[in-house]
């Protein structure tokens, strides 16, 4: 029996069935853009931990910084006893984030946590409940972020009901016959039939729709959303968990637009393979 097959048998016996796998190959070593399985076969890694390894596997600068932190403090909980690297990274992100005014950063662990906290901040700031997301968008697998996600299969089947006050408009996609005008009409209809704008806390959108087909948000839609936000006191959340950290040629995908978001979520390649989001 191969090492992969043996590990697969152990995996079936020990790991919950709800954890899916794209392959039955087990990673034992990785370097740069290559990864080796338990049987010694070498592969080019186009998955990158699902958009996490933008700097490649085991980048020496990333490895050195991880070791430096392990040699100092592994964990103290920033809310109990703060530490400088948290502040240092926040300062670096604040310098680079395409946000009007003074930017500030908080860190959590996963992309879904980042999105949940962005929604919490938007609701607390505006004192409104509603959030409008878009068809095809993906925002995470917690209950709230599944509610925001604009795809039923494969994520949402069997997990409802989802939180209230979440609404969806179609995302403009030429292959689906949906234009920017159609999307804006959907939003107008939501305002007319489902939730008045004075009860909407935020729009949340990916600058590049990921799980919905890797489709960039048209600039005219981003400008229209910014205008609606400014008109009605709504916040614009750019979910950059997948699109951030130079995956589009700029550090943030929002840098391709001539408008700015109020909140930006980050994760994945933010930490070169370590669990960190903000």
Region locations from a protein language model:
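Conserved N-terminal phosphate-binding loop of PLP-dependent enzymes in the Aspartate aminotransferase
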Residues: 1-278
């Amino acid at each position: 029996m191969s090492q992969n097959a043996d590990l697969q048998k152990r995996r079936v016996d020990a790991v919950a069935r709800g954890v899916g796998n794209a392959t039955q190959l087990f990673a034992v070593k990785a370097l740069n853009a290559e990864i080796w399985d338990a049987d010694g076969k070498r592969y080019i890694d186009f998955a990158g931990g699902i958009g996490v390894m933008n700097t490649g596997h085991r980048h020496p600068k990333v490895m050195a910084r991880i070791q430096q932190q392990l040699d100092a403090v592994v964990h103290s909980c920033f809310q109990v006893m703060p530490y400088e690297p948290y502040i240092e990274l926040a300062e670096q992100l604040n310098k680079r984030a395409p946000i009007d005014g003074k930017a500030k950063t908080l860190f959590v662990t996963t992309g879904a946590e980042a999105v949940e906290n962005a929604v919490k901040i938007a609701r607390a700031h505006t004192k409104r409940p509603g959030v409008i997301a878009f068809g095809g968008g993906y925002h995470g697998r917690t209950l709230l972020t599944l509610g925001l996600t604009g795809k039923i299969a494969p994520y949402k089947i069997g997990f409802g009901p989802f939180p209230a006050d979440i609404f969806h408009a179609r995302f403009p996609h030429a292959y689906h016959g949906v234009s920017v005008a159609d999307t804006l009409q959907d939003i107008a209809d939501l305002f007319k039939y489902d939730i008045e704008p004075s009860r909407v806390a935020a729009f949340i959108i990916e600058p590049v729709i990921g799980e919905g087909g890797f489709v960039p948000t048209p600039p005219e839609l981003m400008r229209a959303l910014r205008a609606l936000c400014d008109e009605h006191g709504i916040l614009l959340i750019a979910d950059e968990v997948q699109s951030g950290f130079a995956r589009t040629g700029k550090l943030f995908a929002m840098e391709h637009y001539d408008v700015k978001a109020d909140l930006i979520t980050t994760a994945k390649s933010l930490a070169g393979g370590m669990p960190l989001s903000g």
